[in-house]
């Protein structure tokens, strides 16, 4: 199993990054909260990975540290939460924000995440709260106050389609993704900024 990759970033297409390690290019799906922290193209990055096998595909998910990966591993064990939804959850809010929301039973915050309805949010609170007790690290032992970001203005017309596609990949419906992008669209920002602001506005 591939647990860690160290290599150079060849491509960045949210939420996918192509990382070259020892001459091999690995396509890694990353939560947008982790994607934002990646270095620029051509620079070296270290990614902690989780290999997921499906009937129709073999996918590699990546994270900036082991605690984020541990959280992802526990999320996909929750009934009704697969890798795609787990990725969307950790894209909509940071790992720390999610832990805080669960600990404080913030159902209203969780239902704003893509693909998370009231029943799923309630299930996340019930199941994940118990799972946190068995995990090590500051992330799971320090429930800080959740910070809900405010909407920011950003976008460039030639980046809007790319941003909308990334939101669809994270679980939003095409029409909803386009509406989210249009709502915060303003000339002057790249695709990554557009995606980040759209997700912030959704909260």
UniProtKB/Swiss-Prot annotation:
GO cellular component: cytoplasm; Holliday junction helicase complex; Holliday junction resolvase complex
GO biological process, alphabetically ordered: DNA recombination; DNA repair
Chain residue ranges for the region called Flexible linker: 143-154
UniProt KW rRNA-binding keyword: no
Molecular function as annotated in GO: ATP binding; four-way junction DNA binding; four-way junction helicase activity
Keywords: Cytoplasm, DNA damage, DNA recombination, DNA repair, DNA-binding
Ranges where the record places region Domain I: 1-64
Pfam family, one: RuvA_C
Subcellular location: Cytoplasm
Major localisation: cytoplasm
Alphabetized InterPro entries for the sequence: DNA_helicase_Holl-junc_RuvA_I (IPR013849), Hlx-hairpin-Hlx_DNA-bd_motif (IPR003583), NA-bd_OB-fold (IPR012340), RuvA (IPR000085), RuvA_2-like (IPR010994), RuvA_C (IPR011114), RuvA_C_sf (IPR036267)
Region (Domain III): 155-203
Region (Domain II): 65-142
Self-association and partners: Homotetramer. Forms an RuvA(8)-RuvB(12)-Holliday junction (HJ) complex. HJ DNA is sandwiched between 2 RuvA tetramers; dsDNA enters through RuvA and exits via RuvB. An RuvB hexamer assembles on each DNA strand where it exits the tetramer. Each RuvB hexamer is contacted by two RuvA subunits (via domain III) on 2 adjacent RuvB subunits; this complex drives branch migration. In the full resolvosome a probable DNA-RuvA(4)-RuvB(12)-RuvC(2) complex forms which resolves the HJ.
Comment, domains: Has three domains with a flexible linker between the domains II and III and assumes an 'L' shape. Domain III is highly mobile and contacts RuvB.
UniProt similarity note: Belongs to the RuvA family.
Function: The RuvA-RuvB-RuvC complex processes Holliday junction (HJ) DNA during genetic recombination and DNA repair, while the RuvA-RuvB complex plays an important role in the rescue of blocked DNA replication forks via replication fork reversal (RFR). RuvA specifically binds to HJ cruciform DNA, conferring on it an open structure. The RuvB hexamer acts as an ATP-dependent pump, pulling dsDNA into and through the RuvAB complex. HJ branch migration allows RuvC to scan DNA until it finds its consensus sequence, where it cleaves and resolves the cruciform DNA.
Protein name in UniProt: Holliday junction branch migration complex subunit RuvA
